[in-house]
Amino acid sequence: MVHRDPTIILDAAHNPHGAKALADTLANEFNFDEIVAVVGVFGDKDAQGILLELEPIVDHVIVTQSSSTRAMSSSELEKIASKIFGVDRVFEVSDLATALDRAVSDATRPLSEDTIGIIVTGSVVTVGEARSYLRKKFAK
């Protein structure tokens, strides 16, 4: 967890097994009313399998990509995610920092009693870059 209000959790789940463990933990250990996922996956990973495991617990997903040359393009990931989540629950933001800002904006609802969690997942590089960006963002 790198931030509270909104709660932001980083988890480098980069395969379906890891995504299932993340989904189980979120379902059993947290009490979120809504979950926003920021997901960036490497091109050689099972993106469909990862997203299938996350779908039951994620309300909407922001697909993105890290700076790695191995990263799947956000547009390709959007196509996969839209088949699993439906187009109305998927947003594509190719730049990771902008995707994170979008998630924080989506999760910030001053007049709401809802507890909204943000998870960042899909690859070690995505999570590492997100961690660096979020530390700078919230250090201000």
What are these regions (language model features)?
Residues 30-34, 83-87, 138-139:
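Short helix-capping segments at alpha-helix termini
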Residues 39-44, 65-66, 122:
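Cofactor-binding loop segments of dinucleotide-utilizing enzymes, especially the Rossmann-like FAD-
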Residues 123-140:
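Glycine/aspartate-rich loop-and-adjacent alpha/beta segment that forms the canonical ThDP
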